[in-house]
Amino acid sequence: MYGIEYTTILTILISIILLNYILKTITNTMDYIIFRFLLLIALISPFVRTQNYGMYLPITGSLDAVYTNSTSGEPFLTSTLCLYYPAEAKNEISDDEWENTLSQLFLTKGWPIGSVYFKDYNDINTFSVNPQLYCDYNVVLMRYDNTSELDASELADLILNEWLCNPMDISLYYYQQSSESNKWISMGTDCTVKVCPLNTQTLGIGCKTTDVNTFEIVASSEKLVITDVVNGVNHKINISINTCTIRNCNKLGPRENVAIIQVGGPNALDITADPTTVPQVQRIMRINWKKWWQVFYTVVDYINQVIQVMSKRSRSLDAAAFYYRI
């Protein structure tokens, strides 16, 4: 009886020792294989020219630093281009293969198939509030509208620059602008903005805080308003809240990887009057407005010149944003 129990225990112990030996052998073998594999990769990696995918970055159109390709210097072979256009263009062209056609044409300019993306938008006002700019280079086509020239220039200011915005509760609080880069941005179907500057005793300067009819009107019945008032002075604000919203925004700097192409119009819109736009320059292209196919053909022809004055996936407070017209 006892002999059987001892034999069973001995068998279990031998099995455990044998299993432990097998596991150690497998571990040592795997370590040897992995070490050899990593050594081989380390030895041949300097001789292989491939895209470095070691860093994943969610691209929103604006980063604080430039991330360049570490293994290849060809700008177009390792870059992506997004072309944003109004939905009316696709409706006018009415061709299911038009994007493929344009991709083939971009290929003749050095952009590989699959590196150019086409994205439509229905409303430029909505698009400009929070533009989703996914590519290394982003080109926005904006149709000129002579009924909203001021709105268009302010839309361009929103798209070409990075803004940090917060909602405002004008029914409870007074607000002041702290610097030239601090603006109040109102947007809606009908924005009428009135302001009343206040002294240190919170009494109106040239207006009565209890009577909005005495407030200064800075914008009337507009879709987009970028309001600039005297810095360091509290203001009581009144807007048409049913048709308009207002936000307190700070301009962080230009989106260097974004360009706007103005489609049509007798004159190019000027967004450089704002002292926060540095340097005071704009770059302009011109062709006569005809049809959307003509517009896209021109974009293909000049795309490389446009790209050369942009910066890949970057934003710098010391560099210019760029505005084009065709």
From Swiss-Prot:
One Pfam family cited in the UniProt record for this chain: VP7
Tagged with keyword Nucleotidyltransferase: no
Annotated Gene Ontology cellular component terms: host cell endoplasmic reticulum lumen; T=13 icosahedral viral capsid; viral outer capsid
Glycosylation sites: N69, N146, N238
Leader sequence residues: 1-50
Entry-linked Gene3D superfamilies: Glycoprotein VP7, domain 1, Rotavirus outer-layer protein VP7, domain 2
Residue stretches in coiled coil: none
Location in or out of the cell: Virion; Host endoplasmic reticulum lumen
Broad class of where this protein is predominantly found: virion
Region (GPR motif): 253-255
Binding, Ca(2+) 2: Q177, D228, V229, D301
Binding site for Ca(2+) 1: D95, G206, T214, E216
Listed GO MF terms: metal ion binding
Keyword tags: Calcium, Capsid protein, Disulfide bond, Glycoprotein, Host endoplasmic reticulum, Host-virus interaction, Metal-binding, Outer capsid protein, Signal, T=13 icosahedral capsid protein, Virion
Family: Belongs to the rotavirus VP7 family.
Quaternary structure note: Homotrimer; disulfide-linked. 2 Ca(2+) ions bound at each subunit interface in the trimer hold the trimer together. Interacts with the intermediate capsid protein VP6. Interacts with the outer capsid protein VP5*.
Function: Calcium-binding protein that interacts with rotavirus cell receptors once the initial attachment by VP4 has been achieved. Rotavirus attachment and entry into the host cell probably involves multiple sequential contacts between the outer capsid proteins VP4 and VP7, and the cell receptors. Following entry into the host cell, low intracellular or intravesicular Ca(2+) concentration probably causes the calcium-stabilized VP7 trimers to dissociate from the virion. This step is probably necessary for the membrane-disrupting entry step and the release of VP4, which is locked onto the virion by VP7.
Record's miscellaneous remark: Some rotavirus strains are neuraminidase-sensitive and require sialic acid to attach to the cell surface. Some rotavirus strains are integrin-dependent. Some rotavirus strains depend on ganglioside for their entry into the host cell. Hsp70 also seems to be involved in the entry of some strains. In group A rotaviruses, VP7 defines the G serotype.
Protein name as catalogued: Outer capsid glycoprotein VP7
Organism of origin: Rotavirus A (strain RVA/Human/United States/DS-1/1976/G2P1B[4])
